[in-house]
Amino acid sequence: MADVDDFDSLSNAELRAKMLAQGLPNIPVTDSSRKVLVKRLRASIGGQASPAASPKKTNRRETLAPAPGAPSAPAAASTPVDKLDGNKVAPATKARRTITAAEAKEPVRRLPEEAIRRRPDEADRLRSEEPVAARKPTTAPAAQPVQTRRTSTSSGSERKVVEPLRKPETIVEQPASSKRADREENYLKVNSLIVLESDEEEDEQLVQAADLVEQEHAARQKTTKLASSGTTTYEYKSKVVEPPRRQVYEATAAPVLPPSVPSARAQTTSSTRSYDYASNPAPGRYSSFVRTAAQGYVTAEAPPVASYSSSYKRTYANELSDDTDSKEDQYESTFARNLARLRAERIGDRISPYSRRTLASGNAGSGSLGYEPRARRSLRPNDNSVSEAFNRWLNSLEQKYHIKSKLFIVLLVLLLIGVYYIFY
């Protein structure tokens, strides 16, 4: 232990020589690596493995430094491996490598001490004898893995030769497969003939079905033509209208009627156009009757349809009104018309009554379609006096701050102060 404790007092060169004598690799000793190398040296002297050295680095340095002593260890280690497991080649080689790395350390590290202590002649004699001893065991076991390989390859080749003998068995089965192929070909030929015959039958059925569809379609077209010719039937009834009025909106042109209709139209100057649903002879699901804007209203000595004109003017008050009022008004009841008039009166003028005027007759409240609305007046009243504005301002202050009671208290205090100054 005294030798171990003296490492801290040694210089770098002495410590390096001590490491080489112990069998450690030739590493230069510096102040930074001194502690690590001292630990490795103490571990090697104590019989422990160096903690910081990896096996790869030690193997490289050990094989390079002592050249003659290295082959003796693997040679000695290779003999028991071949004897224990001679049949398996790959595990034997792996076992050699791992055992040599472990066993080669001690003789390599202790060779320099023996060489230093003994004479140089004895060291040379040991180095010359060790390779001779290493050559003897390596020659004999080297042949064993070769023999095992030869036996393994020969056994594998024998198995491979035996396997092709089974091929004639498959050749014997070929005529049976050829019979099956012939049967399948014959079966396909028979089926193909059946498929062709069935295609012809389907084609004939398709042609017959197409003819039936064409015949049914032609019959339907004939029935629809007959039904459409009798759907547009109109019944005109003469009726006296009181009071008469003029149309003040622009109506769309009426559809062209059948040639039998104008004769009935020429007989009456004032008539109501109504559609009689009971007189429709069409048994179909849908009717071709289309109701237009020129039907369903009452005319009283009105000019022809083409001469209708509108004197309705667009103003700011009715700018946002519906554009289809003229079309929808004919379906409205009198109650709906009166309600619309009352709403217009409320919206228009808030002081004077607002009336809907008919442009043609000038009667107010008659429920006519066209009217000329007046411009809306401003919401501010006309008479704004200063006293009324001041009263409104006082009322607002009273509602918000209750200022009357506070003003009364202030005036009472001022009155008391005045009385005090007057009498005292």
Swiss-Prot record:
One of its GO terms (biological process) is positive regulation of BMP signaling pathway. The modification Phosphothreonine is found at residues 63, 324, 358. Disruption phenotype: No obvious phenotype. However females are sterile and aging males become prematurely sterile. Males and females exhibit a range of defects in their germarium that may be age dependent phenotypes. Most phenotypes result from defects in germline stem cell (GSC) differentiation that often lead to GSC loss. Also affects somatic cells of the ovarian stem cell niche, with delayed terminal filament formation and cap cell loss. In 10 day old males, stem cell niches display a decrease in hub cell number but somatic cyst stem cells are unaffected. It is found in: Nucleus inner membrane; Nucleus, Nucleoplasm; Cytoplasm; Chromosome. Residues 1-50 are annotated as: Required for binding to Med and germline stem cell maintenance. Residues 1-30 form the LEM domain. A motif (Nuclear localization signal) lies at residues 92-99. Residues 400-424 are annotated as: Essential for nuclear membrane localization and germline stem cell maintenance. Residues 271-400 are annotated as: Required for binding to Med. The modification Phosphoserine is found at residues 44, 50, 54, 152, 192, 198, 321, 326, 378, 385. Residues 42-186, 259-278 are annotated as: Disordered. Changing residue 63 to E: Phosphomimetic mutant which displays a decrease in the number of mitotic cells. Keywords: Cell cycle, Cell division, Chromosome, Cytoplasm, Cytoskeleton, Membrane, Mitosis, Nucleus, Phosphoprotein. Changing residue 63 to A: Prevents phosphorylation and displays an increase in the number of mitotic cells. Its main location: nucleus. Residues 65-80, 262-274 have a biased composition (Low complexity). One of its GO terms (cellular component) is spindle pole. Inner nuclear membrane protein. Involved in the attachment of membrane vesicles to chromatin during nuclear assembly, and is probably required for centrosome maturation and cell cycle progression during mitosis. Essential for differentiation of certain tissues and the maintenance of progenitor cell populations. Required for the differentiation and maintenance of male and female germline stem cells (GSCs), as well as the maintenance of somatic cells in the GSC niche. This is Otefin. It comes from Drosophila melanogaster.
